[in-house]
A protein has these predicted regions:
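Conserved, structured core segments of small domains
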Residues: 1-90
Length: 90
């Protein structure tokens, strides 16, 4: 989960936050490479479901995101083990 971090500027809209263009470009690259299964926003939280063999691989993907290294966002990693696939196959 991505959430606003200590460097989030409350006076600026999300698109104007520092590093957002690079953040979007990084997520776009990961999507094109097939490393992101699903992404969504709810409230001030962003959820990204990665296709990765382990947590270390997810951490490596996140390390390339400038909004995390700058503190604009924080990220939490949770294991995701679907038991019902519905219309989204993982």
């Amino acid at each position: 989960r991505f959430r606003p971090g200590p460097a989030w500027d409350q006076a600026r809209p999300p698109a104007a936050q520092s590093g957002m263009a690079e953040h979007g470009a990084n997520l776009g690259r990961l999507r094109r490479e097939g490393r992101i299964q699903l992404g969504a926003r709810y409230g001030d939280t962003g959820l990204v479901v990665f296709r990765a063999p382990d947590e270390a691989a997810v951490r490596a993907h996140l390390a390339a995101d400038p909004t995390l290294s700058s503190g604009v966002f924080t990220a939490e990693i949770d294991a995701f083990a679907p038991f019902y696939h519905g219309s989204t196959r993982l």
